[in-house]
Amino acid sequence: VMSTIGHVKLARFLAKFQRDYHGVELEVSEASVQELKNRLEQGDLDLAVLNPLEGLGAAFRVHDLYSERYVVVFAPDHRLATLNAIKLVDLSQEPYVDRLSCEMRDLVMGACRERNVSLYARFRSEREDWIQSMVLARIGFAFMPEYSVTSPELLQRPLIEPAVARTVSLASVPGRPYSPATAAMVRAAQTFDWPG
């Protein structure tokens, strides 16, 4: 699983899968998109849940699971808390918490440059729990996928102008036969009521 995927939604799917398919053992590990691709190609993984940002090419079979918007998250007393949605230009000069493992980071930073939006990262981390804790501690705001926000204390507003979204997909290697458990997982993922 890509490390930026919201675990709550995925856990609901995995719980239903476990109820429907007793006896199937699951192992979940986190990695970057590149590492997941490598492990799939080498046969170390049967399936990967990831964002095929620029496509995975013919080397992979991809089943889209759901799409999610990027939101701006901040502490409840933040000056932007009264807004229903946030434009990128609203964030210029705001203290920022940088999600280093975000696969969409370059895209968002490019949109900032195009609009002359200046962000100063006061804190950087690859860990989603640290990012949310620092935002809650009022270090700054963060951009996050809407289903990855797990702290109920944080406020979140959709990012507009530009709106940014990602697709979360299930990837496998075409031509490689599925084990019965893997085939069951693929069928279950295709019929699950995502995002969960």
Please report, for each region that a protein language model flagged, where it lies by residue.
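Central regulatory/effector-binding core of bacterial HTH transcription factors
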Residues: 1-56, 124-127
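A late-sequence structural motif
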Residues: 9, 158-196
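Hydrophobic hinge/microswitch elements
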Residues: 32-37, 41-45, 51, 101-155
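Alpha-helical segments flanking ligand/cofactor-binding loops in enzyme cores
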Residues: 37-38, 63, 89, 132-133, ...
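Flexible hinge/capping segments at coil-to-helix
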Residues: 59-70, 74-96, 180
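Short beta-strand->loop
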Residues: 61-71, 142-146, 153-168
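Secondary-structure junction motif
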Residues: 94-115, 178-186, 196
